[in-house]
Amino acid sequence: MQSHPEVAVLRYGHRPGRDDRMTTHVGLTARALGADRVLFPDNATQAAETVRDITGRFGGPFDVERTTELNATIEDWPGVVVHLTMYGEQLQSVDDEIRTTHREEPVLVVVGGEKVPGDVYEAADWNVGVTNQPHSEVAGLAVFLDRLFDGRELEQGYENAERRVIPEELGKHVVDVEDGDHAEGAAAGDGD
């Protein structure tokens, strides 16, 4: 969310073929829930393309980057590093402190994709567990960002969108922004 110091999400690790959907969803969740950018491992080409495409169609601002320097990204981060792991401190015991720190400093949220080395745990300012139970890293990211932004991310607008979803009780309603009266809809339960 552009009114605060930056929030970036680093996907730490990606196994092509196995993690494609999950890595893509890390990026989509970061975008939808207020982060300013996502950094993917260099081999996450398809995930990066998909998130860029969604950002182009549904608006931003949101940046997508790929890097071969995952550890250097963490080590050189100019603010605080939050590593999401089920083994970390309970979110509810540290979220106020992280939120307060974020008022002054950018936050890098590290989301593991495969076994995360101990160096990441040591480099993080906080190792945070959303439930301390096995769960999806996408779910953990969503809950963390909602706590970080205190729900404000749910009201954010998106600039330069080509398409916009019109909320409805039933069905799907998507309009082209240039032609607001042209809607594409489908009955509830059709497709995604």
Swiss-Prot record:
Cellular component annotations (GO), alphabetically ordered: cytoplasm
Top EC category: transferase
Compartments reported by the entry: Cytoplasm
Residues at which S-adenosyl-L-methionine binds: 84, 112-116
EC annotation from Swiss-Prot or TrEMBL: 2.1.1.206
Biological-process GO terms, alphabetical: tRNA nucleoside ribose methylation
Molecular function GO labels: tRNA (cytidine(56)-2'-O)-methyltransferase activity
Gene3D superfamilies linked to this entry: 3.40.1280.10
Domain of life: Archaea
InterPro entries assigned to the protein according to its UniProt record, in alphabetical order: Alpha/beta_knot_MTases (IPR029028), tRNA_m1G_MTases_N (IPR029026), tRNA_mtfrase_aTrm56 (IPR002845)
Catalytic reaction annotation: cytidine(56) in tRNA + S-adenosyl-L-methionine = 2'-O-methylcytidine(56) in tRNA + S-adenosyl-L-homocysteine + H(+)
Pfam families: Trm56 (PF01994)
Coiled coil: none
UniProt keywords, alphabetically: Cytoplasm, Methyltransferase, S-adenosyl-L-methionine, Transferase, tRNA processing
Biological role stated in the UniProt entry: Specifically catalyzes the AdoMet-dependent 2'-O-ribose methylation of cytidine at position 56 in tRNAs.
NCBIfam families: PRK03958.1 (NF003048)
Subunit structure: Homodimer.
Family: Belongs to the aTrm56 family.
HAMAP family named among the record's database cross-references: tRNA_methyltr_aTrm56
Protein name: tRNA (cytidine(56)-2'-O)-methyltransferase
